[in-house]
UniProtKB/Swiss-Prot annotation:
CDD domains cross-referenced by the UniProt entry: UBA_EF-Ts
Organism: Thermotoga maritima (strain ATCC 43589 / DSM 3109 / JCM 10099 / NBRC 100826 / MSB8)
InterPro entries associated with the record: EF-Ts_dimer_sf, Transl_elong_EFTs/EF1B, Transl_elong_EFTs/EF1B_dimer, Transl_elong_Ts_CS, UBA-like_sf
Protein family per UniProt: Belongs to the EF-Ts family.
Location, primary (coarse class): cytoplasm
Entry function: Associates with the EF-Tu.GDP complex and induces the exchange of GDP to GTP. It remains bound to the aminoacyl-tRNA.EF-Tu.GTP complex up to the GTP hydrolysis stage on the ribosome.
Gene Ontology MF terms: translation elongation factor activity
Domain of life, source organism: Bacteria
Compartment(s): Cytoplasm
Keywords, in A-Z order: Cytoplasm, Elongation factor, Protein biosynthesis
GO CC aspect terms: cytoplasm
Gene: tsf
Protein name: Elongation factor Ts
Length: 199
């Protein structure tokens, strides 16, 4: 079956995938757009881990200011090409993640970003809280509490405020699968009026 350039272009606009990948997916799907999108997603999901090490020099910085003007967030989200950085889906996710930071107050982007001394301090606090428990279950309880800490303190581990069936990292991975590029939140800063001041 001959695949038209218009069909390839349409699939590329929908997915952000490369021209050759779009052509192959359409050929494999016999011109069926929905099947081609699914093929590209499966291929992208399988390669998301491979792309994690690739350089992300493009991207955007988004600013979100809560309607009352008392909370603001700057968030940097990166990708590999300016083509992906300009897509509405990329920009919308970055903006929604800035809202996530405003609402949920994470301290770190990923669990790997949490300093070892902070983790040890948290463990000490948890152990002190459960010092009367039998030794054989203390570590399990500590690990469970530490997991809850990561879910609150790390943006990627948080439940997404616009869809509580997903974590933020799931949304990042879905966009990696769709675009075929490494995508990551590099950093964010959250501001709140009066925060950090003592009289």
């Amino acid at each position: 079956m001959e695949i038209s350039m218009d069909l390839i272009k349409k699939l590329r606009e929908m997915t952000g995938a490369g021209i050759l990948d779009c052509k192959k997916a359409l050929e494999e799907a016999n011109g069926d757009m929905e099947k081609a999108v699914e093929i590209l997603r499966k291929k992208g999901a399988a390669t998301a881990e491979k792309k994690a090490g690739r350089t992300t020099k493009e991207g955007i910085i988004v600013a979100y200011v809560h309607f009352n003007g008392r909370i603001g967030v700057l968030l940097e989200m990166n990708c590999e090409t300016d083509f992906v950085a300009r897509t509405d889906e990329f920009k919308e996710l970055a903006y929604n993640l800035a809202k996530q930071v405003a609402a949920m107050k994470p301290l770190y982007v990923r669990r790997e970003d949490v300093p070892a001394e902070v983790i040890e301090k948290e463990k000490e606090i948890y152990r002190a809280q459960i010092k009367d428990k039998p030794e054989n279950i203390v570590e399990k309880i500590v690990e469970g509490k530490l997991e809850k800490f990561f879910e609150q303190a790390c943006l990627y581990e948080q439940t997404y405020i616009f869809d509580d069936t997903k974590k933020v990292k799931d949304l990042i991975n879905e966009l990696i699968a769709k675009t075929g590029e490494n995508i990551r939140v590099s950093r964010f800063t959250r501001y709140e009026i009066g925060e950090g001041y003592e009289d």
